From Swiss-Prot:
Annotated compartments: Cytoplasm
Organism domain of life: Bacteria
Similarity comment text for this entry: Belongs to the peptidase M17 family.
Name by which UniProt lists this protein: Probable cytosol aminopeptidase
CDD domains linked: Peptidase_M17
Biological role stated in the UniProt entry: Presumably involved in the processing and regular turnover of intracellular proteins. Catalyzes the removal of unsubstituted N-terminal amino acids from various peptides.
One of the GO biological process terms: proteolysis
First-tier enzyme category under EC: hydrolase
Gene3D superfamilies in the record: Leucine Aminopeptidase, subunit E, domain 1 (3.40.220.10), Zn peptidases (3.40.630.10)
């Protein structure tokens, strides 16, 4: 689909359809009022008749409105004007796209980007309209033998901005939105892939393909033989029960004017299937453990968006690919592992495996002398209990970095919430036989997991995002969400100084 921005009066638009808002109760938005005036009160007369109340998501398609050049006018219910917030705005955009496709419109001029959304500017409204549109059109049906035929005639969407001064800002918002949407789609596709296809080698192949597609990206793969030489015993232990080789895929993006500038490092947990190992999970819902690689998928998506945006940064993306399976060769509860850092870990539960993979990845990236490190993982069910399915958990050893990420989460709408990491929580990881256990009991499970990782991130500024509750949705519409790609890319945009410059 082609996106563009323009600034103009609604009555002068020659298009298949003009999209304008209506508030409750039957109140025309400023743009709709202009159309109503030109049409001699035609639209307001329909509202007085009760054809549209203005409730969120209500739609009314008008044909041949008097004195209007466009073929049709789509009235979109936006709820109460003062209550129009971010979530409702995105939902309205998605519903609008669905309706435009259902009505057969090939092009449309959308004035919803001129609505007032609390605390948001034109850049945000245009970018979110692009991201929401792309999200609403996403499908994953490549494994269906009979693919459903979906009617999608809409090919061109123009967003109107209030003044010509904002055209450049709108164009930048479209470019950013398309790049982020591309990264989100890549992340969703990886997450939704079945585990018999998306194994660690598949993650590696996608990382190589990214390097093939962009000159700014180089990729190297570390397999089990090299991991042994590096002393990544903890990482290797998790995957030793699977016939699929563990692979750590490293993508290096160099866009900074100084190629030696310290990089930002992103690490994603890539458990392509997590059965729990010897501490096996219940069978109900185990199919969703293919999503345990969504941390890696989000890092891959962020790297793809970064390459498309061509930001002036150096960034390293690490996909920590592995599979946790039960077998006669699996690691066991009671095993003591010596990590790459030299610290020892008593395995108390083989289903707390993500941290055992990440700890060696965190040690490995010390060689880059990073500006900062952010790891992303579907790490703990405790995070779902604490924050539900709407907000990711955040833990950090550096207040400014944590504030940057929280700010990026608010800007992008891909929200995170910082959890504490006090010394008292570290005491729960004590082991009588090793430097630490790999779990800290039932209490504060997300925090103790973060405390565990922090022991391997002492040489740089570090943050951990737990996306266990936000990386996918269950039920009839189950699937990967692509989160937190938007948060990560916003963080990188902010670091580059290009977040919403005109």
């Amino acid at each position: 689909m082609e996106f563009s921005v323009k600034s103009g009066s609604p009555e002068k638009q020659r298009s298949a359809c003009i999209v304008v808002g209506v508030f409750e109760p039957r109140r025309l938005s400023p743009i709709a009022e202009q159309l109503d005036k030109i049409s001699g009160g035609y639209i307001s007369s329909l509202l007085r008749r009760g054809d549209l109340e203005g409730k969120p998501g209500q739609m009314l398609l008008l044909h041949q409105v008097p004195n209007i050049l466009s073929e049709r006018v789509l009235l979109v219910g936006c709820g109460k004007e003062r209550e129009l917030g971010e979530r409702q705005y995105k939902d309205i955009i998605k519903k609008t796209i669905s309706t435009l496709n259902e009505t057969g419109s090939m092009e449309a001029v959308c004035f919803l980007t001129e609505l007032h959304v609390k605390g948001r500017d034109t850049y945000w409204k245009v970018r979110q309209a692009v991201e929401s549109t792309k999200d609403s059109l996403y499908t994953f049906n490549q494994f269906k033998s009979n693919k459903p035929e979906t009617r999608r005639p809409l090919r061109k969407l123009v967003f109107n901005v209030p003044t010509r001064r904002e055209l450049n800002l709108g164009e930048k918002a479209i470019a950013h939105g398309l790049s982020i949407a591309s990264g989100v789609k890549a992340s969703k596709d990886l997450g939704n892939m079945p585990p018999n296809v998306a194994n660690p080698a598949y993650l590696a192949s996608q990382a190589r393909r990214l390097a093939d597609d962009y000159e700014t990206v180089t990729t190297k793969i570390i397999g089990e033989e090299e991991m042994k030489k590096l002393g990544m015993t903890s990482y290797l232990a998790v995957g030793q029960g699977s016939h699929n080789e563990s692979m750590m895929s490293i993508m290096e993006y160099k866009g900074h004017p100084d190629p030696t500038a310290k990089p930002i490092v992103l690490i994603g947990k890539g458990l392509t299937f997590d059965s729990g190992g010897i501490s096996i999970k219940p069978s109900e819902g185990m199919d969703e453990m293919k999503y345990d690689m969504c941390g890696a998928a989000s890092v891959f998506g962020a790297m793809k968006a970064l390459a498309k945006l061509n930001l002036p940064l150096n960034v390293v993306g690490v996909l920590a690919g592995c599979e946790n399976m039960p077998s006669s060769n699996s690691y066991r509860p009671g095993d003591i592992l010596t990590t790459m850092s030299g610290q020892t870990v008593e395995v108390l539960n083989t289903d707390a495996e993500g941290r055992l993979v990440l700890c060696d990845a965190l040690t490995y990236v010390e060689r880059y002398e990073p500006e900062c490190v952010v790891d992303v993982a579907t790490l703990t069910g405790a995070c779902v209990v604490a924050l539900g399915h709407h907000i990711s958990g955040l833990i950090s050893n550096h207040n400014p970095l944590a504030h940057e990420l929280i700010n990026a989460s608010e800007q992008s709408g891909d929200r995170a919430w910082r959890l504490p990491m006090a010394e008292e929580y570290n005491e729960q990881l004590s082991s009588p036989f090793a430097d630490m256990g790999n779990i800290g009991g039932k209490a504060a499970g997300t925090i103790t997991a973060g405390c565990f990782l922090s022991r391997f991130a002492k040489k740089y500024h570090w943050a951990h995002i737990d996306s266990a509750g936000t990386a996918w949705v269950s039920g009839a519409n189950k699937g990967s969400t692509g989160r937190p790609v938007s948060l990560l890319v916003q963080f990188l945009l902010n670091r580059s100084g290009q977040e919403n410059e005109e």
